[in-house]
Amino acid sequence: MDAPFESGDSSATVVAEAVNNQFGGLSLKESNTNAPVLPSQTTSNHRVQNLVWKPKSYGTVSGSSSATEVGKTSAVSQIGSSGDTKVGLNLSKIFGGNLLEKFSVDKSTYCHAQIRATFYPKFENEKTDQEIRTRMIEMVSKGLATLEVSLKHSGSLFMYAGHKGGAYAKNSFGNIYTAVGVFVLSRMFREAWGTKAPKKEAEFNDFLEKNRMCISMELVTAVLGDHGQRPLDDYVVVTAVTELGNGKPQFYSTSEIISFCRKWRLPTNHVWLFSTRKSVTSFFAAFDALCEEGIATSVCRALDEVADISVPASKDHVKVQGEILEGLVARIVSSQSSRDMENVLRDHPPPPCDGANLDLGLSLREICAAHRSNEKQQMRALLRSVGPSFCPSDVEWFGDESHPKSADKSVITKFLQSQPADYSTSKLQEMVRLMKEKRLPAAFKCYHNFHRAEDISPDNLFYKLVVHVHSDSGFRRYHKEMRHMPSLWPLYRGFFVDINLFKSNKGRDLMALKSIDNASENDGRGEKDGLADDDANLMIKMKFLTYKLRTFLIRNGLSILFKDGAAAYKTYYLRQMKIWGTSDGKQKELCKMLDEWAAYIRRKCGNDQLSSSTYLSEAEPFLEQYAKRSPKNHILIGSAGNLVRTEDFLAIVDGDLDEEGDLVKKQGVTPATPEPAVKEAVQKDEGLIVFFPGIPGSAKSALCKELLNAPGGFGDDRPVHTLMGDLVKGKYWPKVADERRKKPQSIMLADKNAPNEDVWRQIEDMCRRTRASAVPIVADSEGTDTNPYSLDALAVFMFRVLQRVNHPGKLDKESSNAGYVLLMFYHLYEGKNRNEFESELIERFGSLIKMPLLKSDRTPLPDPVKSVLEEGIDLFNLHSRRHGRLESTKGTYAAEWTKWEKQLRDTLVANSEYLSSIQVPFESMVHQVREELKTIAKGDYKPPSSEKRKHGSIVFAAINLPATQVHSLLEKLAAANPTMRSFLEGKKKSIQEKLERSHVTLAHKRSHGVATVASYSQHLNREVPVELTELIYNDKMAALTAHVGSVDGETVVSKNEWPHVTLWTAEGVTAKEANTLPQLYLEGKASRLVIDPPVSISGPLEFF
């Protein structure tokens, strides 16, 4: 969960057309004024290159050398010297005189920008999870890298850059999240340092300020809303240490983080390193064995056993958070990491905790409980309790309460127009400019920098910029741009920049320009620790089902359960389990539990939806009672019963809670219920709903008419009928549902665009209630990075609509706002690329038909057409941000819309020949769609294949033997031995069933432990020879004695006392009882047939 972005005017700004791309220069000269000073003509290359920050030694200010200075200090790199205090700060300069409005950009205007706080860049891996695993194993096996794994705590991102540098949440600052963060961080110092805490707090803040550093933490607390389990204590865990310097942020390695944290006595995470093929493959196998039932104790124990190095956390997850573990983060790091970690662990032992037994004052929960009236009261109380080192001023939270904290949006325009004062500024301008040009889903929010209030003058302005990326698609698209422009700085998560706009009369300095250009050569790092970029950024997040059932299945399903009912909720959680690839057994268990939960909470709450921020108040007692019923239930739930009551101290949070899911969507296994919404094949004895997730102009009505009149229908006797949306009065989909109930075995052509998930849920509900399948038909298109429909497709749709006459829905050439209407439909699909769009439809409905639209050999879209569409999209974004869904003929941009609608028509008419020529002929399209529908109607359709991986299915490791070879051995034994032939007679069918699953068990999770089963992963899928030497049997069971061979000279050892292949068990006898056959033989209760010579059979080592 992360802080919601602060509210404010979300209107977009029109970036100035002409942006100055040339560089200016700035040296950090000493000055008696607070204005930046431009370099002289004698500035050397060496001096400007020193603007690139160099790593510092970590440690306390009193115990280590001071920070390396970059040149001399100036107002550009200093916090204002006025000494902010909790009262009396003069903010009149900020709000007096409309300084920004009067600040004009000319040749003497410069900008200095520095990153003030940031977290790691977010790289969206384009590979599947399985491909990432394979690459990780390959790199570790070759000695090119080490795999690092850490615990994923359930909390909020919190960043701290010193008492003047500021405190930040993921996309905001100056709110309850950061107030709680500062309080908890200060309390960690008091707990660690005891009576020395005030002195160490001051030193720590001074150290961060002088070295321009930022530490990032996971803030885990019970006062900011529920995750998977309410933590037993409030704490932080340091996850990143960043040197911001005067250039590109430099992140510490994990060993450096641990060294830094142990010197300052800050909490560190539990970390494991895997540097061999055996250990890294064992890790992935251990996770697969635990992912459906793992809790903190079992996971940490298993990883401790298989890892090469284990570094325990400063705070035990079980003691401060609880047993419910969100997940693990695995990433590739340098092959030297193990050696570096060993050195750090040797030189920096865990520090003492001097304040453990001291009275630290009121706790976070006590303070929040005492100030429940409003959020500002809670923040003030928390900040007063922090002390002067961490909070010398509360200006960041309250500023001047008679004025807004946000600044005018023109800050960004002037930032981009100004000459960059140094190389770092030029790179930040490059980032923002590209994100705007590519229209990435991001907001650039500017705020007054209250810490610099005393330094402000008409020619010297200071602001804070928050770069808020709205969706993961923004990171994906930016990463794609980095492939074409390797010199781009990464797009960071938690991205805050200090901006200084100022005037200088020194003129331009050509030597400084050259110096800055040369500095850029030193910025490209090439490979990180010898790793190529793609490999250096390999990371995978792995979450546990015990956490997901609480957050994703219970909490995130509340709105569906209360709004749409139990049936829709069931569809939701089945789809989630399918996406995750949950094993069949767990699906059945979860269905039973979640159905019971849905009935329980609806009965208790009625129509009053349970709050997602306090859902555990109801869910935890329910889960506790459910777990007590059986051991199986207890394993499913993981842990329950230690509920922390939050109702009296929950912080007042303005806005919805946010959760980073980071789930990779895959086709899952067969759902656990007999009537799933998603079907592996469409059944021909059911009804059929054909619907269109499309845009006006896709020819769906014309297609429906042709399909309705097609001779012979769809090859069977089911009636076909259609319902045209433009002719239906009232709500359309309830009418379709009525028709389905009247004619449950009919084929319904739903002639209406179905553009969003709410409609898809209604269709799923119809399918479930009326025993029908649904088939989506979509116009084929390459799409864009964030939309399943390309601009080419959009152009054709608009062209078709503007050729219509007398359209029933009044959307034709006479419609004055037709272009706006199509843009509105187009944006309903925003946020999904083509692959994501199609995958979700297939996951929901089990089928998909692509309606041919554009010829593959067409020439590119003409520039005038592309340009007018892009202008329309920009205008739509401006309009929707300011006015929401208000008609285009109303509002601020009405005149611009009128002008654009005319320009659109003129442009499309001028390019009508091109737009007509690129379309697939209508008759060809109809024929292809009809044939695919016939296949579906017959029940012969199978959905497109996709990678399927069953997680959580590892229970034991075994060698899988070919059934034909074992069967051949039995035939030979029967032919040579009448007694054996007599024994086998009458058991052929049951033996054949066993032979289909014949295997030699090596280790079982319940009997031998997760780590033991996982240890076989280094030989996964390798052929292992097995020598069969004898057959032992009686009237209840029979099995072959097996001697397991070796792989690459290493003997594969079975942990079973008697390795064997079970051939047969009588009814009521479990396979496990076959383990007793050797003892029964010694007791004279079983017979033995020696196989001479022994028979050798090979099979792959697999997990089951």
From Swiss-Prot:
Record comment: activity regulation: Requires the presence of NTP, preferentially ATP rather than dATP, UTP, CTP and GTP, respectively, to mediate ribonucleotide 5'-phosphorylation.
InterPro entries: tRNA_lig_PDEase, tRNA_ligase_1
Top-level enzyme category: ligase
Tissue specificity statement from the Swiss-Prot or TrEMBL entry: Mainly expressed in proliferating cells and tissues such as root meristems, the vasculature of developing plantlets, flowers and elongating tissue.
Enzyme Commission no: 6.5.1.3
Major subcellular site: nucleus
Entry annotation: catalytic residues: 152
Consequence recorded when altering residue 326 to A: Loss of tRNA ligase activity
Catalytic activity: ATP + (ribonucleotide)n-3'-hydroxyl + 5'-phospho-(ribonucleotide)m = (ribonucleotide)n+m + AMP + diphosphate
Domain remarks: Has three domains each corresponding to an enzymatic activity, namely in N- to C-terminal order: ligase, kinase and cyclic phosphodiesterase (CPDase).
Functional summary from the UniProt entry: Essential component of stress-response pathways entailing repair of RNA breaks with 2',3'-cyclic phosphate and 5'-OH ends. Tri-functional enzyme that repairs RNA breaks with 2',3'-cyclic-PO(4) and 5'-OH ends. The ligation activity requires three sequential enzymatic activities: opening of the 2'3'-cyclic phosphodiester bond of the 5' half-tRNA leaving a 2'-phosphomonoester (CPDase activity), phosphorylation of the 5' terminus of the 3' half-tRNA in the presence of ATP (kinase activity) and ligation of the two tRNA halves in an ATP-dependent reaction (ligase activity).
Family: Belongs to the TRL1 family.
Name this polypeptide is given: tRNA ligase 1
